[in-house]
Structures are given as structure tokens and as C-alpha cells.
């Protein structure tokens, strides 16, 4: 995601982010999903990475479901781009890692 349109605000160092998603899986299977956020400068150098999840089977009481996970942080002042990645991990059988309503919001402080 291109952030160069708000580079002045980011440069002032008063922009934070909120990353949210409903994450989960199937039954007692330990298939799981995580969401990563990575901020890069204009040369493609990684400035900051963070993320939310995963939600393991034990976190779901070995039932099928999705649960809200949230993360907040500061956007590095020289950020030009941000990438959001969903990683699904398979424990066995089919991959039943779930994600819904993934959201990244940038906020002024």
C-alpha cells in the first residue's frame, strides 16, 4: 500500500496504526492464521514488522470459530509503503485456517 500521499504526516511521527482481524480455525485441528504488517522506506528497506494471531485450537477450546485479534503500533517516520500479509499454517489434512474482516487503519495521534 503506497503511503507517499501522506508522507508529510508520517514524517512528523504522529501516525499510528490499528491492525484487526477475526482469526480462527476448525475444531481441534491446530490449523491457524496470522496477519503480518510490514512498513518499508522508499528504497524497500524494512523499517518495522508486527502482527496479530495466530489463534490455536486451544485458544478456541478445540471448537470451530473465529476470534477478534488486535494490534496497535507507531508508523515509522520514513515509511513509504506498507504490506499486509495473511499466513495460513496447516497442521494436518486440509488447511482450515480462517480470517475475516482484516483491517489496517492509520490514525493521527
Regions found by a protein language model. Name each.
Residues 1-19, 62-63:
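Extracellular/lumenal carbohydrate-interaction signature centered on repeated Trp-anchored short motifs
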Residues 29-31, 64-65, 76, 88-108:
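Extracellular carbohydrate recognition
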Amino acid at each position: 500500500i503506497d503511503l507517499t500521499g501522506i508522507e508529510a504526516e508520517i514524517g512528523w511521527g504522529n501516525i499510528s496504526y490499528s491492525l484487526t482481524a477475526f482469526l480462527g480455525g476448525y475444531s481441534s485441528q491446530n490449523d491457524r492464521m496470522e496477519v503480518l504488517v510490514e512498513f518499508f522506506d522508499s528504497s524497500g528497506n524494512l523499517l518495522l514488522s508486527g502482527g496479530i494471531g495466530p489463534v490455536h485450537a486451544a485458544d478456541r477450546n478445540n471448537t470451530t470459530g473465529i476470534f477478534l485479534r488486535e494490534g496497535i503500533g507507531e508508523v515509522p517516520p520514513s515509511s513509504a509503503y506498507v504490506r499486509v500479509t495473511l499466513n495460513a499454517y496447516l497442521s494436518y489434512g486440509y488447511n482450515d485456517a480462517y480470517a475475516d474482516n482484516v483491517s489496517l487503519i492509520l490514525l493521527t495521534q
